[in-house]
Amino acid sequence: MNFNATLFGQTVAFILFVWFCMKFVWPPLMNAIEERQKKIADGLADAGRAAKDLELAQIKATEQLKEAKVTANEIIEQANKRKAQIVEEAKVEAQTERAKIIAQGQAEIENERNRVKDDLRKQVALLAIAGAEKILERTIDPEAHSDIVNKLVAEI
């Protein structure tokens, strides 16, 4: 057995094996590793961007919520002002209507009072004439009667 030839054969076989691996096995493995590294790096970058996007979205949502609250408060304030304005207008309108109704009532009362006074004057005049007729025991003619009633009404 020749130790040198075996060693030389094994060395040649090992060199061929290394060359074959370097030529055909190693490049696909390196490409697969590089692709995996790239995917991992892209995934980490995407995760970082997603975290930043999430943070920005949360900030934006918080700002929109604050704006919505401010807008809601403004709308409520406007509604309260409008409510107060409507109530005030209703009060003014009610006061005007009240004054109008009171004025109408007072005018009706005054008209009724004047009518009653006139009726009362006529009745008093008739009673006075009736009393005078009894006192005088004579009847006054209708023309004189009307004249006397009108004079008494005017005096009363």
Curated annotation (Swiss-Prot):
Keyword check for tRNA-binding: no
Q: Which Pfam families match?
A: ATP-synt_B (PF00430)
Membrane topology, as annotated: Single-pass membrane protein
GO function terms (MF aspect): proton-transporting ATP synthase activity, rotational mechanism; proton-transporting ATPase activity, rotational mechanism
Specify the superkingdom: Bacteria
Listed name of the protein: ATP synthase subunit b
* Chain segments annotated as transmembrane: 7-29
Subcellular localization(s) per the UniProt record: Cell inner membrane
Query: Subunit info?
Result: F-type ATPases have 2 components, F(1) - the catalytic core - and F(0) - the membrane proton channel. F(1) has five subunits: alpha(3), beta(3), gamma(1), delta(1), epsilon(1). F(0) has three main subunits: a(1), b(2) and c(10-14). The alpha and beta chains form an alternating ring which encloses part of the gamma chain. F(1) is attached to F(0) by a central stalk formed by the gamma and epsilon chains, while a peripheral stalk is formed by the delta and b chains.
What SUPFAM superfamilies does the database record attribute to this sequence? F1F0 ATP synthase subunit B, membrane domain
Record's InterPro entries?
A: ATP_synth_B-like_membr_sf, ATP_synth_b/b'su_bac/chlpt, ATP_synth_F0_bsu_bac, ATP_synthase_B_chain
Q: What does this protein do?
A: F(1)F(0) ATP synthase produces ATP from ADP in the presence of a proton or sodium gradient. F-type ATPases consist of two structural domains, F(1) containing the extramembraneous catalytic core and F(0) containing the membrane proton channel, linked together by a central stalk and a peripheral stalk. During catalysis, ATP synthesis in the catalytic domain of F(1) is coupled via a rotary mechanism of the central stalk subunits to proton translocation. Component of the F(0) channel, it forms part of the peripheral stalk, linking F(1) to F(0).
Q: What is its main location?
A: membrane
Q: Is Cell membrane tagged as a keyword?
A: yes
Q: What's in the GO CC field?
A: plasma membrane; proton-transporting ATP synthase complex
Q: Which UniProt keywords apply?
A: ATP synthesis, Cell inner membrane, Cell membrane, CF(0), Hydrogen ion transport, Ion transport, Membrane, Transmembrane, Transmembrane helix, Transport
CDD domains the record matches: ATP-synt_Fo_b
Name the family the entry cites.
Answer: Belongs to the ATPase B chain family.
Alphabetical list of HAMAP family matching this protein: ATP_synth_b_bprime (MF_01398)
